[in-house]
Design a protein with these regions (language model features):
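Short, low-complexity N-terminal intrinsically disordered segments enriched in polar/charged residues
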Residues: 4, 11-41, 45, 152-158
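Hydrophobic pocket/interface hotspot
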Residues: 28, 42-44, 51, 71, ...
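A solvent-exposed, acidic/Ser-Thr-rich amphipathic alpha-helical stretch
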Residues: 49-98
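Short, surface-exposed coil-to-beta transition loops
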Residues: 88-90, 116-123
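A short hydrophobic beta-strand element
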Residues: 99-108
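Beta-strand elements of well-folded, non-transmembrane domains
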Residues: 110-112, 129
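Low-complexity, intrinsically disordered terminal/linker segments enriched in charged
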Residues: 134-158
Length: 158
């Protein structure tokens, strides 16, 4: 009887973890579709009140934490909207997930303010209380610097 109870408990735990992983993957997949839509505030409902976003890298817009209000009121319209005025199409190529987070690997297709801007991304989502608690965005910051900000590469002579 003890073995039956133990097996039943393991099945319940496994099923609960499996459901939360699938729920997290769905939420992560839906988030950017909503955030980059005509009504990005719909995505705000998926975020935790203490939400934090950080664009990682070595550019002038990198490593600045944005809370929920700053992400939706400033980052999306004033940074993304101005650099990619015609929007961006993001295609998910893979997801890696567990019960605490999801890494979403994506390819982007966009016209930036200085021409074609097709980058590759990894968005790392962490969850708390069934909501998106944080997102860290990784991409080619070299491409951001050269295609969006017109920075030039300089050869360093030895």
């Amino acid at each position: 009887m003890k073995q039956f109870v133990y097996l039943f408990a393991v099945i319940i735990v496994f099923t609960a973890c499996s459901n939360s992983i699938e729920d997290n993957k769905k939420m992560a997949g839906d988030f950017l579709d909503l955030a980059l839509s005509a009504n990005p505030l719909e995505a705000q409902e998926l975020t935790h009140p203490d939400f934090k976003f950080v664009f990682m890298g070595n550019t002038e817009i990198s490593n600045i934490p944005y809370d929920r209000d700053a992400y939706f009121d400033y980052w999306l319209p004033q940074v993304v909207g101005k650099l990619l005025p015609t929007g961006i199409t993001l295609t998910t190529t893979d997801m890696i997930a567990d019960e605490n987070g999801v890494a979403v690997i994506m390819e982007g297709d966009a016209e930036g303010i200085n021409g074609e801007y097709d980058n590759k991304y990894v968005f790392v989502y962490k969850f708390k209380d069934g909501k998106i608690f944080s997102i860290h965005e990784y991409n080619s910051d070299l491409l951001v610097a050269t295609r969006l900000y017109k920075n030039e590469l300089v050869k360093i002579s030895k």
